[in-house]
């Protein structure tokens, strides 16, 4: 079994480091990261990500979506363009991503922008339902609101609540709906006690691994762009929190990811 990095912005990692895409993928493969999901944050990413993944279809797949952090930039027409892109998608497109809600940034919490966030999230959930695709969800200080949307709009393919940070009870509600929990760099920090306890208690078949590269640096690499190969650090941290053998953890997190995004 291998590693599947279920959440990256590989296009931005390449832009940030200036390294050839082939080198980024080789580095990942040396750490046994055989599959990488590249997710969009705005409409301008769509073509870049499609072209990038077409070069390495055995290792890369992608998701198209409109991220809540960029809600001020998103136009209503972007939802139309997203629908068109999903309708014309190739087989490398395996998710609607990255979508979600954001309440950690005060500037995005005006009544107008919060309503727009909710509208874009709901619209993209319906697109995922329409095209029978899973979702990869951003949730920051919005677990209750996200849960309400997911319960109201059931999807056939479900998906992942990515980069989870929160309590066991919050995570368990998503798991009970059938969603997976994205485990990333947060658990490499001992101070993230609540999240570490949650990940330790959840069923292993509810977990997938991710890096969110170039974001969410793991402990020991603060201040550096995160990379798919550093999924190994999150895996090691996960193994210290779980009672299962490391090989079983690797096997099931791989299979869980493939079940959703392959």
From Swiss-Prot:
<dbReference type="InterPro" id="IPR032466">
    <property type="entry name" value="Metal_Hydrolase"/>
</dbReference>
<feature type="binding site">
    <location>
        <position position="7"/>
    </location>
    <ligand>
        <name>a divalent metal cation 1</name>
    </ligand>
</feature>
<dbReference type="Pfam" id="PF01026">
    <property type="entry name" value="TatD_DNase"/>
</dbReference>
<keyword id="KW-0378">Hydrolase</keyword>
<dbReference type="GO" id="GO:0016788">
    <property type="term" value="F:hydrolase activity, acting on ester bonds"/>
</dbReference>
<feature type="binding site">
    <location>
        <position position="9"/>
    </location>
    <ligand>
        <name>a divalent metal cation 1</name>
    </ligand>
</feature>
<feature type="binding site">
    <location>
        <position position="138"/>
    </location>
    <ligand>
        <name>a divalent metal cation 2</name>
    </ligand>
</feature>
<dbReference type="GO" id="GO:0005829">
    <property type="term" value="C:cytosol"/>
</dbReference>
<feature type="binding site">
    <location>
        <position position="162"/>
    </location>
    <ligand>
        <name>a divalent metal cation 2</name>
    </ligand>
</feature>
<comment type="similarity">
    <text>Belongs to the metallo-dependent hydrolases superfamily. TatD-type hydrolase family.</text>
</comment>
<keyword id="KW-0479">Metal-binding</keyword>
<feature type="binding site">
    <location>
        <position position="212"/>
    </location>
    <ligand>
        <name>a divalent metal cation 1</name>
    </ligand>
</feature>
<feature type="binding site">
    <location>
        <position position="98"/>
    </location>
    <ligand>
        <name>a divalent metal cation 2</name>
    </ligand>
</feature>
<protein>
    <recommendedName>
        <fullName>Uncharacterized metal-dependent hydrolase HI_0081</fullName>
        <ecNumber>3.1.-.-</ecNumber>
    </recommendedName>
</protein>
<feature type="binding site">
    <location>
        <position position="98"/>
    </location>
    <ligand>
        <name>a divalent metal cation 1</name>
    </ligand>
</feature>
<dbReference type="GO" id="GO:0046872">
    <property type="term" value="F:metal ion binding"/>
</dbReference>
<dbReference type="InterPro" id="IPR001130">
    <property type="entry name" value="TatD-like"/>
</dbReference>
<dbReference type="InterPro" id="IPR018228">
    <property type="entry name" value="DNase_TatD-rel_CS"/>
</dbReference>
């Amino acid at each position: 079994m291998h590693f599947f990095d279920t959440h990256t912005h590989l296009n931005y990692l390449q832009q940030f480091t200036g390294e050839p895409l082939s080198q980024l993928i080789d580095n990942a493969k040396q750490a046994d990261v055989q599959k990488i999901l590249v997710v969009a944050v705005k409409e301008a990413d769509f073509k870049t990500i499609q072209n990038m993944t077409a070069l390495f279809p055995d290792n890369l797949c992608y998701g198209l979506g409109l991220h809540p952090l960029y809600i001020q930039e998103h136009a209503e027409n972007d939802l139309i363009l997203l629908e068109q892109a999903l309708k014309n998608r190739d087989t490398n497109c395996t998710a609607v991503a990255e979508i979600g809600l954001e309440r950690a940034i005060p500037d995005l919490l005006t009544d107008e922008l919060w309503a727009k966030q909710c509208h874009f999230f709901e619209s993209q959930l319906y697109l995922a339902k329409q095209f029978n695709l899973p979702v990869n969800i951003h949730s920051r200080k919005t677990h209750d609101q996200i849960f309400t949307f997911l319960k109201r709009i059931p999807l056939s393919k479900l998906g992942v609540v990515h980069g989870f940070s929160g309590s066991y009870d919050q995570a368990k509600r998503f798991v009970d709906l059938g969603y997976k929990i994205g485990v990333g760099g947060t658990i490499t920090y001992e101070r993230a006690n609540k999240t570490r306890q949650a990940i330790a208690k959840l069923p292993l078949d509810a977990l997938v691994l991710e890096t969110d590269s170039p974001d969410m640096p793991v402990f020991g690499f603060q201040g550096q762009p995160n990379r798919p190969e550093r999924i190994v650090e999150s895996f090691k941290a996960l193994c210290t929190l779980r009672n299962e053998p490391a090989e079983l953890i690797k096997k099931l997190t791989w299979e869980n990811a493939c079940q959703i995004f392959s």
